[in-house]
Amino acid sequence: MTSHPRDTPQFYLTAPSPCPYLPGQEERKVFTHLVGRRARDLNEILTQGGFRRSQTIAYRPACETCRACVSVRVVVEDFAITGSQRRILQRNAELIGTPEPNRPASEQYALFRRYLDARHGDGGMVDMTVLDYAMMIEDSHVDTHLVVYRERGPDSAIHGRGVGAPVAVCLTDVLADGLSMVYSFYDPDEASRSLGTYMILDHIRRARALGLPYLYLGYWVGGSRKMDYKAKFKPQERLMPQGWVRVE
């Protein structure tokens, strides 16, 4: 087990492994533990510096020969919705997203498993057990919660919640300058609803309602079809060597 002081971040470098996004490339990551009294502050600083959170770990790519992974964040106040994105919102008008504590549930894991098997059957997460899922959701020392999307029911106007099994779920961190979508998944049988795009659009609305300037989407990877969608939310800022650069 790696030992580390509780309030002083120590950074480590992973061994090379096959890149999950670009064939023929190897990835390495630099990471640190988000623990102790300063975990929340450290997560804020590192996210603004291009890191991503996974449980109590913050990491960013540190590949030797490739710089394709670029951290992106949507400029919420200036976001310009496209016609196709507006239609996606209309298509999912009967969904209600409810913020809930970051506690795992069996119905979440059932949806998560179906999503992985259908969309990422060859990915590194495909063997995650229910315990692994619980750790992904619960294991955190930062301000985080779930947004669980369900269909609108007859009493939803009264209590503000959807009914039935979840259609989509997002684990969301709350930062001083924005929301960060840590991980999201959805019903693979509802592909025509573009639920991944819908959750991003909904989180843009949530960030705006909270008065937060950014929505952090993680890494856009040029040349990766899996990550192309992140370039469709503009204006956005991309973290370059000179700092955050606006892209219209």
UniProtKB/Swiss-Prot annotation:
SUPFAM superfamilies: Acyl-CoA N-acyltransferases (Nat) (SSF55729). It catalyses: N-terminal L-glutamyl-[protein] + L-leucyl-tRNA(Leu) = N-terminal L-leucyl-L-glutamyl-[protein] + tRNA(Leu) + H(+); N-terminal L-aspartyl-[protein] + L-leucyl-tRNA(Leu) = N-terminal L-leucyl-L-aspartyl-[protein] + tRNA(Leu) + H(+). The keyword Acyltransferase applies. Its main location: cytoplasm. It is found in: Cytoplasm. GO terms for molecular function: arginyl-tRNA--protein transferase activity; leucyl-tRNA--protein transferase activity. One of its GO terms (cellular component) is cytoplasm. Pfam families: ATE_C, ATE_N. Keywords: Acyltransferase, Cytoplasm, Transferase. GO terms for biological process: ubiquitin-dependent protein catabolic process via the N-end rule pathway. Its EC number is 2.3.2.29. Functions in the N-end rule pathway of protein degradation where it conjugates Leu from its aminoacyl-tRNA to the N-termini of proteins containing an N-terminal aspartate or glutamate. Belongs to the R-transferase family. Bpt subfamily. This is Aspartate/glutamate leucyltransferase.
